[in-house]
Regions:
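Acidic donor-diphosphate engagement hotspot in glycosyltransferases and nucleotidyltransferases
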Residues: 47, 99-101, 184
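Donor nucleotide-sugar binding loop of glycosyltransferases
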Residues: 15-18, 43, 71, 97
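Hydrophobic helical membrane-anchoring modules
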Residues: 1-6, 10-11, 17, 24, ...
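A conserved acidic beta->alpha catalytic loop
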Residues: 40-49
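Active-site acidic short loop of glycosyltransferases
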Residues: 3, 32, 82-85, 110, ...
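Acceptor/aglycone-binding surface of glycosyltransferases and processive sugar-polymer synthases
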Residues: 66-81, 86, 98-178, 205-215, ...
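Short, acidic, metal-binding catalytic loop of nucleotide-sugar glycosyltransferases
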Residues: 24-33
Length: 245
């Protein structure tokens, strides 16, 4: 199997129209050698209606079956499936940030184990977000930045790069939503691996429906939020990180 410089994991649920638009942007804006892993739930996903179209792009596209349902399981399957030195988890409906993929990869080459696409650093933005969701994600991110040793201003965005070194070491315990992203960030920080961020743009999706379920996922996010704080305030060290056998 060819080893790519980078793999882009995209969890999907009937994102066919979005993928065609997104992949055109990838073709234009991404210079790094990469392949895409599309992680789907069910065989009736509309991605199967556009398989011939997907063959027209410059990069390889691989379909990865989610053994369960939901975004967390889909992403974890994609992360485990890959063989590249780093992986970016990218939203299927993000048409604003394909031009920062090369920058994220550059940060990885310079030693970062996580590169956060940050909405809240200088040059980043978040627009059209429902008010309650906006309050929660801004409060969580700003308080972790101020009260913990996590060195980035956007703790909750699921769009980020992870090194294979980190993924092969750390056990992902999260079971729902996109909490794996905050979990890996908190564990990476506890391991004292390098974390960096670059500005990213975010807008509420206009096509399809979001799978972000704020209330049902909140307890899982809170667990890893407190984990991040305990690294600083309770002096939890690398020996308290659950690693793979």
């Amino acid at each position: 199997m060819k080893k790519n410089s980078l793999e882009i994991v995209i969890p999907i649920y009937n994102e066919g129209n979005n993928l065609i638009k997104l992949f055109k942007l990838f073709d234009t804006n991404v210079k790094t050698d990469f392949r895409v892993l599309l992680c789907y739930d069910k065989q009736d996903d509309n991605v199967f209606d556009i398989l011939e179209v997907l063959k027209n792009f410059k990069f390889e596209v691989v379909l990865v079956k989610n053994p369960l349902n939901g975004p967390c399981s889909a992403v974890k399957e994609g992360l485990n499936f890959g063989n590249s030195d780093c992986v970016i988890v990218y939203p299927a409906d993000d048409f604003l940030n394909s031009d920062i993929i090369d920058k994220m990869y550059k940060n990885f080459l310079e030693g970062s184990d996580i590169v956060v696409a940050s909405r809240f650093t200088e040059g980043g933005s978040m627009k059209g977000c429902p008010i309650l969701k906006s309050i929660l994600v801004r409060a969580a991110s700003s308080s972790l930045f101020l009260l913990s040793s996590i060195p980035v201003r956007d703790a909750s965005n699921g769009f980020r790069l992870f090194s294979r070194r980190l993924l092969e070491k750390v056990e992902i315990e999260s079971k729902i939503g996109f909490a794996y992203s905050l979990e890996l960030l908190s564990k990476c920080n506890r391991l004292r691996y390098k974390i960096s961020e670059i500005p990213a743009q975010w807008e509420e999706r206009s096509e399809g429906s979001s799978r972000f379920k704020i209330f049902s996922w909140l307890p899982e996010y809170l667990k890893w939020y407190l984990y991040g704080l305990s690294t600083t305030w309770l002096k939890r060290g690398p020996d308290r990180v659950k690693i793979k056998n």
